[in-house]
A protein has these predicted regions:
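Stable alpha-helical structural segments in soluble proteins, enriched in small hydrophobic residues
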Residues: 26-30, 65, 83, 169-170
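Buried hydrophobic packing segments
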Residues: 23, 58-62, 79-83
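Surface "functional belts" at beta-alpha junctions
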Residues: 2, 69-168
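N-terminal beta-alpha supersecondary unit
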Residues: 1-46
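DPxDG-like acidic metal-binding loop motif
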Residues: 41-75
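Short glycine-aspartate micro-motif
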Residues: 37-43, 51, 94-98
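Residues at secondary-structure transition points
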Residues: 10-18, 49-53, 57, 74, ...
Length: 170
């Protein structure tokens, strides 16, 4: 499909109070432009439990009312794909999307270029040794809002940090 309309908010954890407003504006836009909603996609996480519950509840309500399917999107895989397609890296690099989980923790995973799990999805405490066993042998491309705080901690020669890769909620 093609994104017809979207909103972005980078003002911290305010999505719970804005989600309903954004959905109404998008539904009004769709009605006014004659755009048919064929499905609703929602993040399956990982992420804030409360945020995911709110998003899934809103999405399920929309699907029920519109009689359309609900599509679950794994956020870390989406970030890895976005990083792959926006940047050119050699074939043998690994991709490590990260979602900030407060303090020095991130939700993360490591994927190869076919999106096979190299390190499973989980919550990880970041220190100078995080992923060092992989970094000793392969280049890893770190992306997502959680990678920003890791840049000053993971100082390995094979660590590549890409900025500006964030999931888009539409």
């Amino acid at each position: 499909g093609v994104v017809q309309c979207h909103f972005e908010n980078f003002e911290g954890p305010s999505h719970a109070s804005l989600l309903g407003v954004y959905v109404k504006q998008i539904m009004d836009f769709s009605r006014d432009k004659g755009v048919k909603v064929d499905a609703v996609a929602v993040s399956s996480g990982p992420g804030s439990y409360t945020g995911l519950r709110i998003g899934v509840s809103e999405a399920k309500g929309l699907c029920f009312g519109l009689k359309v399917p609900l599509i679950s999107v794994p956020t870390l895989e989406l970030l890895a794909c976005t990083t792959m397609f926006r940047n050119y890296f050699e074939e043998d690099v690994l991709y490590c999307p990260m979602i900030d989980a407060r303090r020095m923790e991130v939700y993360s995973a490591v994927y190869d270029n076919a999106l096979n799990d190299v390190v499973p999805v989980g919550a990880y405490v970041i220190d100078e040794h995080t992923f060092s066993d992989l970094l000793d042998n392969r280049r890893i491309v770190f992306s997502g809002n959680g990678s920003t705080k890791c840049k000053d901690v993971i100082k390995h020669r094979n660590a590549i940090f890409v900025e500006g890769i964030v999931p888009l909620a539409t």
